[in-house]
């Protein structure tokens, strides 16, 4: 299966609810590489890459988010592979 890279902006009640840490945990569980960070406008930005099936699984997870989050929308775009190793929470 091919490796792909996706980039997303997640809106709604997604800050102050453990969204970044939960995203990192889910990405690591799926064996993905990338990063997640809060934006000043209240959204969360995520970039991740890996095997297509796992990348799409994280995309579906982002549409729900962790239990305390209320996701209002996810804007996703495909990008070229970034060559990232590991998954981190950016500040």
Swiss-Prot record:
- In terms of superkingdom, the source organism counts as Bacteria
User: Membrane-spanning residues where?
Assistant: none
Q: Quote the EC number.
A: 3.6.1.7
What's in the keyword line of the UniProt record?
A: Hydrolase
Picking any one GO molecular function of the record gives: acylphosphatase activity
Q: Where is the Acylphosphatase-like domain?
A: 5-91
* InterPro entries referenced in this protein's UniProt entry, alphabetically: Acylphosphatase, Acylphosphatase-like_dom, Acylphosphatase-like_dom_sf, Acylphosphatase_CS
Pfam families per UniProt: Acylphosphatase
Name the residues annotated as catalytic in the UniProt entry: 20, 38
- Give the SUPFAM superfamilies listed for this entry: Acylphosphatase/BLUF domain-like
Record keywords: Hydrolase included?
Answer: yes
Which catalytic reaction applies to this protein?
A: an acyl phosphate + H2O = a carboxylate + phosphate + H(+)
The UniProt similarity line reads: Belongs to the acylphosphatase family.
What name has this protein been given in UniProt? Acylphosphatase
Its source organism is Pseudomonas paraeruginosa (strain DSM 24068 / PA7)
């Amino acid at each position: 299966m091919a490796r792909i890279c996706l980039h997303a902006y997640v809106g709604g009640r997604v800050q102050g609810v453990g969204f970044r840490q939960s995203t990192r945990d889910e990405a690591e569980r799926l064996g993905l590489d990338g990063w997640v960070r809060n934006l000043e406008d209240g959204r969360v930005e995520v970039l991740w890459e890996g095997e297509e099936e796992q990348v799409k699984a994280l995309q579906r997870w982002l549409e729900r988010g962790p239990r305390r989050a209320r996701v209002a929308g996810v804007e996703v775009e495909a990008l070229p592979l970034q060559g990232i190793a590991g998954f981190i929470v950016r500040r």
